[in-house]
């Protein structure tokens, strides 16, 4: 039996990555920076294949009850779920850390 987890992205998380790239490349006019930033995010997400629960749970609802973890990467925060039975990690969302993330999540209930 392997100790590694399969890591995947939700549709929302993939959209978040596209939006992050688009904003940095097109609004800030820094496509190289956008590519590098996505590379750093993806590298950290890939590292969740081993001991994914090492990062803390969020402390606000409803995500705390869902056992949502958060992983900071530069100015961004990756939110993900761990399924120990399936040995799987699913990245749920990726947000810029300066946003009111709790407010965004709770407004989408």
Question: Where do the PLM segments sit?
Answer:
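Basic, Lys/Arg-enriched alpha-helical interface segments
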Residues: 1-65
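Enriched for short, Lys/Arg-rich terminal
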Residues: 28, 73-77, 81-109
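Basic/aromatic recognition patch in beta-strand/loop cores that engages polyanionic ligands
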Residues: 51-85
């Amino acid at each position: 039996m392997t100790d590694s987890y399969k890591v995947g992205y939700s549709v929302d998380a993939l959209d978040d990555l596209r939006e992050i790239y688009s904003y940095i490349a097109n609004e800030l006019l820094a496509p190289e920076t956008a590519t590098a930033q996505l590379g750093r995010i993806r590298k950290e997400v890939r590292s969740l294949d081993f001991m994914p629960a090492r990062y803390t749970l969020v402390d606000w609802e409803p995500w705390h009850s869902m056992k949502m973890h958060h992983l900071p990467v530069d100015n961004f925060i990756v939110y993900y779920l761990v399924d120990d039975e399936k040995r799987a990690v699913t990245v749920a969302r990726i947000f810029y850390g300066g946003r009111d993330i709790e407010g965004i999540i709770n407004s989408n209930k």
